[in-house]
Swiss-Prot record:
It is an enzyme of class 3 (hydrolase). Disulfide bonds: none annotated. Belongs to the LamB/PxpA family. SUPFAM superfamilies: Glycoside hydrolase/deacetylase. Its EC number is 3.5.2.9. The lineage of its organism: Bacteria, Pseudomonadati, Pseudomonadota, Gammaproteobacteria, Pseudomonadales. GO terms for molecular function: 5-oxoprolinase (ATP-hydrolyzing) activity; ATP binding. NCBIfam families: PRK05406.1-3, PRK05406.1-5. This is 5-oxoprolinase subunit A 2. It comes from Pseudomonas syringae pv. tomato (strain ATCC BAA-871 / DC3000). Keywords: ATP-binding, Hydrolase, Nucleotide-binding. One of its GO terms (biological process) is carbohydrate metabolic process. Forms a complex composed of PxpA, PxpB and PxpC. The keyword Acetylation does not apply.
Length: 251
């Protein structure tokens, strides 16, 4: 069995660092990095350094655009027209793509951040407009999304390749949606690792309602801003390796 392991990277801004500031150490355990592109976190120099590090470690990179919300770290919903949101996302994609192009690193994927990710999971107008633009711009760019979400369905309809995600450090409800929160709590590394292995081997995750939910996915996501993220990533990777599950990029 093979699985992708992704995490959000480069979510610092100038002298400010999000979470435990463990990007450098955590990147050794993953196969794909979602690099913040300046609107919810990140700045040009941080983006450049994160690309350099990913290149050294052989980690694939993707754009991680968010709402224009530095203060709220992109976790606050912004009620903007679909065209404005797509303009902002393409602007952020272009910024990362050029910084990566200088270093000869191709972009593997595109993954919206936080509240924008959840918005596109539900809003068909914005999701369809984004995918239509990606089809014109980069029809082979992988789109990371929640399985069964609006944007996942639209992308599959229009032919944009998708990578369905499983969230190692977020709770699920019976609808199959992650339970979005602005107050991220710490997790026990052994419990997270066991949850991931169960999802990989059995295709099941326990929901907040206490029932099992069947889930299909291509990539495991673990957030670098979760308290204790490095220990979570290390425990998860060790569990995957121990179970004979190969961690590699989706293509």
């Amino acid at each position: 069995m093979q699985i992708d392991f992704n995490s959000d990277m480069g979510e610092s801004f100038g002298a400010w660092t999000i979470g435990d500031g463990v990007d450098t150490e955590l990147m050794a355990f993953i196969s794909s990095a979602n690099i913040a592109t300046g609107f919810h976190a990140g700045d040009p120099s941080t983006m450049r350094r994160t690309i350099e590090q990913a290149k050294r470690l052989g980690v694939a990179i993707g754009a991680h655009p968010g709402f224009r919300d530095l203060v709220g770290f992109g976790r606050r919903h912004i009620n903007a027209p679909a065209q404005e949101l797509v303009d902002d996302m393409l602007y952020q994609l272009g910024a990362l793509r050029e910084l990566a192009r200088v270093q000869g690193v191709p972009l593997q994927h595109f993954k919206p951040h936080g509240a924008l990710y959840m918005h596109l999971a539900r809003d068909e107008e914005a999701a369809r407009l984004l995918v239509e633009n990606l089809q014109r711009l980069e029809p082979d760019l992988l789109l990371y999304c929640m399985p069964g979400s609006v944007i996942c369905n639209v992308a599959q309809e229009l032919g944009q390749p998708v990578v369905r995600e499983f969230y190692a450090d977020r709770a699920y409800d019976l609808s199959g949606s992650i339970v979005f929160t602005r107050n991220v709590r710490a997790h026990d590394p052994a419990e997270v690792a066991a949850r991931v292995i169960r999802a990989c081997q059995q295709g099941l995750v326990r929901t907040v309602e206490g029932d099992d939910l069947a889930i299909q996915f291509d990539s495991i996501c673990l957030h670098s801003d979760t308290p204790g993220a490095l220990a979570l990533a290390q425990a998860t990777r060790q569990a995957l390796d121990g179970a004979g599950i190969e961690v590699r990029t989706p293509r």
